[in-house]
Amino acid sequence: MTDQRGPPPPHPQQANGYKKFPPHDNQYSGANNSQPNNHYNENLYSAREPHNNKQYQSKNGKYGTNKYNNRNNSQGNAQYYNNRFNNGYRLNNNDYNPAMLPGMQWPANYYAPQMYYIPQQMVPVASPPYTHQPLNTNPEPPSTPKTTKIEITTKTGERLNLKKFHEEKKASKGEEKNDGVEQKSKSGTPFEKEATPVLPANEAVKDTLTETSNEKSTSEAENTKRLFLEQVRLRKAAMERKKNGLISETEKKQETSNHDNTDTTKPNSVIESEPIKEAPKPTGEANEVVIDGKSGASVKTPQHVTGSVTKSVTFNEPENESSSQDVDELVKDDDTTEISDTTGGKTVNKSDDETINSVITTEENTVKETEPSTSDIEMPTVSQLLETLGKAQPISDIYEFAYPENVERPDIKYKKPSVKYTYGPTFLLQFKDKLKFRPDPAWVEAVSSKIVIPPHIARNKPKDSGRFGGDFRSPSMRGMDHTSSSRVSSKRRSKRMGDDRRSNRGYTSRKDREKAAEKAEEQAPKEEIAPLVPSANRWIPKSRVKKTEKKLAPDGKTELFDKEEVERKMKSLLNKLTLEMFDSISSEILDIANQSKWEDDGETLKIVIEQIFHKACDEPHWSSMYAQLCGKVVKDLDPNIKDKENEGKNGPKLVLHYLVARCHEEFEKGWADKLPAGEDGNPLEPEMMSDEYYIAAAAKRRGLGLVRFIGYLYCLNLLTGKMMFECFRRLMKDLNNDPSEETLESVIELLNTVGEQFEHDKFVTPQATLEGSVLLDNLFMLLQHIIDGGTISNRIKFKLIDVKELREIKHWNSAKKDAGPKTIQQIHQEEEQLRQKKNSQRSNSRFNNHNQSNSNRYSSNRRNMQNTQRDSFASTKTGSFRNNQRNARKVEEVSQAPRANMFDALMNNDGDSD
């Protein structure tokens, strides 16, 4: 596009003294289409006059001649960066069609819209149609045709000369001359259609060689085809005669000679075929192999053709007396084949394909007949293989064994230390084609007897969904929604819910199973079993034992129990004893204890006390309940019970005597001697979960339970203060001589149980009066010395510190004070008290928050008050009365008379002496 503008016309003068320039498309700021300039300066800063024949350039440019708008190195027209029209802000308009520029003009005082790229196909002008030029990766011109060559070779790779082959056949029959055969061999053959490769779509070639397909070539092709058909007929007739046993010796010799001639003359026969112009196909589509059958003929077609391509058709050599006419059997009949050479291509009708398929089938049958039968060769059986392997010498190390050269050794990576023989897949697969064995009936029977197929597998086998067993669904089924299929399956499942026999699991009814079990029992041989003879000393439940005699008391009504039965009944009743059933069960125990009134030695009473004592020591948590049981027995026991060995003590006093004597005996022995000890007599540290561990745990539990039981007996005044003084003195004696942890734990348990009550107890002797508080002061001094010594474990040390704080700080107010057995009513009462306490705390917190908000409301007024001296007013804060109340309580308790023992009437002065 050239610039056709001439020199600018002279500028007319305006009345106001300013020059008015004519409008140009590419001026600095002149308006287009002769529109008036509406700027404030009346276009004062318009374009400069031409200087040195260079338009739109100031005279003395600061940066030389190439300042802003000089486009010496640019294209065509001069355009400026501030032109708001005509492709604004761009220096060229090459991206737009010139015919489109006039339509892009905008009136004055309007900014041009943002311009976008418009494809050439969308340009609304009469421009040449846009055509996409395909990429041509082939450097050769597309008009040059590709020549395709086909090489026909035998099975051994030698080329087959069809030319000489036809000449020999024609010479033998005298039908045509050799010259005619040469011309026919150059023409197209029926193989050209199969051997023609499929050209890709981007390499479509125009048909430029249509002149070669004329009437002469067509006639030669027909003659060659006719020759092939004749050879096929002869070949078929010879095969039929051979099959029927009618072939003669002369024909055999003739076929043998023909076969030898064919083998000796096998030069290359190259058939050039013209490229076929076909419809474009996808380049990724693979070319199919034309011929591949048991006749041995195969055509190799490459996937991509870039130049002159040579294709080889390989024919297997005949294996029997038949000649090399196997090639001719690809065509069956001349009348069913039509060849069309129009537009340089060759077309074979559907009848040709059917003919070739039938001929290939016939050839397959022929080859099957001529090949030696493999069934005639005797193959070894699997049983023989197993027998041979059983006799063979085993290999000690398969990885070190010397294998033959053609055998690949097993891979060492499959070696396992726990398994002797481990082979990899590569080692085993190399014998796939080398070892062939046939299954013999004996092996089949032995293996099939070990295979069990559940009946439900065969019943649930899916039906044949297609002709070949595959899942051939119709297009409508393929597009079915997954939800619909799931609904159908759920409906089927719901229908099967009523009948479990059609479910996936093998279901048999109970009746069927019972019948099957009965049949199995009937079939099983019955063994004679000797009748069971009961032993004389067998165990019999007591409830089923029938007493031959029943002992009755002298009154004739009360039944007397023997020693074993008393122990059994006591254990049963003590196991059922709870605070809810305390009255009823304790009454039954008291009835058993009253049986001693018919005895002289109090044997039954001793058994009752012994069982209660063992139960109390073994269950320390329930010690308080068993102490209450002892108190009831002492209080309600029949006073007529006597013991001839303890004269002067009867009834309740006898019970206290038995109880105190049993507690004193066990307390003196302690529970350290029951721990497992070594050869030197020192206690051992048993292993966890061992027998010694459980023995030590039981001894510790019973020892601490004894101390706890003695403490609760003292709290119930069944034991006097003198007895408790003796217990503490014995413990303090042990504390002075390097105490053991067992002794310290006994002291801690006794203080937790009786500390509060013993603090205010006192014992009067003829010499002086002993107070419990004084004894406890001496005891805690010893404990403090042990704590400071640091020779004990941290567990015992912290327990001693807790007991010391319990007396000095908490004043025996322990949270564990009420820990013990409780009735259901007591548990409900405690829960109700706890709930009320929480509610009261919540209400108090709300009240305090309300008062705090009110106090904050008047805090500003209090801040403004004048500060006074702290000692100028008396504080209204009341002191804590906790210490005063505590001291007053101590004074009252000291002033009170000593508690009267509830069993003082029973023990009198003799109780302390015990």
From Swiss-Prot:
Comp. bias (Polar residues): 26-44, 298-325, 339-348, 868-886
Region Disordered: start-end pairs: 1-84, 128-205, 240-351, 457-535, 833-914
Pfam families assigned: eIF_4G1, MIF4G
Residues in MIF4G domain copies: 567-810
Ranges annotated as biased composition (Pro residues): 1-12
Ranges where the record places region Interaction with PAB1: 201-315
Modified residues (Phosphoserine): S74, S503, S913
SS bond list: none
UniProt keyword terms in alphabetical order: Cytoplasm, Initiation factor, Phosphoprotein, Protein biosynthesis, RNA-binding, Translation regulation
GO molecular function, one term: translation initiation factor binding
InterPro entries: ARM-type_fold, eIF4G1_eIF4E-bd, eIF4G_eIF4E-bd_sf, MIF4G-like_typ-3
Entries under SUPFAM superfamilies matching the protein: ARM repeat (SSF48371), Eukaryotic initiation factor 4f subunit eIF4g, eIF4e-binding domain (SSF101489)
Assembly description: Component of the eIF4F complex, which composition varies with external and internal environmental conditions. It is composed of at least eIF4A (TIF1/TIF2), eIF4E (TIF45) and eIF4G (TIF4631 or TIF4632). Interacts with PAT1 in a RNA-dependent manner.
Protein purpose: Component of the eIF4F complex, which interacts with the mRNA cap structure and serves as an initial point of assembly for the translation apparatus. Stimulates translation by interaction with polyadenylate-binding protein PAB1, bringing the 5'- and 3'-ends of the mRNA in proximity. The formation of this circular mRNP structure appears to be critical for the synergistic effects of the cap and the poly(A) tail in facilitating translation initiation, recycling of ribosomes, and mRNA stability. TIF4632 is probably essential when TIF4631 is missing.
Name assigned to this protein: Eukaryotic initiation factor 4F subunit p130
Gene encoding the protein: TIF4632
